[in-house]
């Protein structure tokens, strides 16, 4: 059993829709601050679907999904990564205003990922390209943040063993991190 799991640790997965309303974001950040003040360690994993779709459309890229996963070519990945990084920075600033010592962390800092195999749709293989799943999580990296009183705020951009960045579904990133914390 790892050290993180012996302490009270709570993982929030928050979707992009929930982050778009300033009042809701403030309430969320205040609740996180209260939890931390009571001795709970908090990890936050967030998505950004609506903002990503808007950013893609502004770049003239039509968002495409297969079985709920975003088909991610290199241009799409650049937009996804930039948008998630921006959302992350905004959330971290909001948490800091609520008294939380938060740090924005791309998923590839705490997790190794692998590229997803092509999905079968109507009998045809569809390559999702730069899309992956979490294969392992670096608990020591998370513990190091906790040891310094830092709340990790993870956005779901992973990297494979070659260092290639991958778009990871936020639910999958949260699940991978939560499983590793057991």
Task: Identify the residue ranges that each predicted region occupies.
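Nucleotide/pyrophosphate-binding catalytic subdomain
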Residues: 1-182
């Amino acid at each position: 059993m790892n050290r993180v799991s012996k302490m009270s640790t709570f993982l929030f997965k928050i979707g992009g829709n929930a982050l778009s309303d300033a009042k809701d974001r403030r309430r969320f950040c205040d609740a996180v601050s209260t939890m931390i003040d009571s001795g709970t360690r908090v990890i936050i994993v967030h998505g950004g679907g609506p903002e990503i779709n808007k950013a893609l459309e502004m770049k003239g890229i039509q968002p495409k999904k297969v079985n709920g996963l975003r088909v991610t070519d290199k241009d799409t990945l650049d937009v996804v990564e930039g948008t998630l990084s921006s959302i992350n920075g905004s959330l971290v600033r909001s948490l800091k205003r609520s008294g939380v010592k938060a740090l924005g962390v791309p998923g590839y800092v705490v997790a190794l990922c692998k590229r997803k195999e092509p999905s079968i749709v109507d009998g045809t293989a569809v390559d999702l390209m730069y899309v992956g799943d979490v294969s392992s999580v670096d608990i020591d990296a998370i513990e190091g943040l906790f040891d310094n009183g830092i709340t990790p705020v993870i956005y779901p951009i992973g990297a494979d063993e070659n260092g290639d960045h991958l778009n990871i579904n936020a639910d999958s990133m949260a699940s991978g991190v939560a499983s590793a914390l057991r």
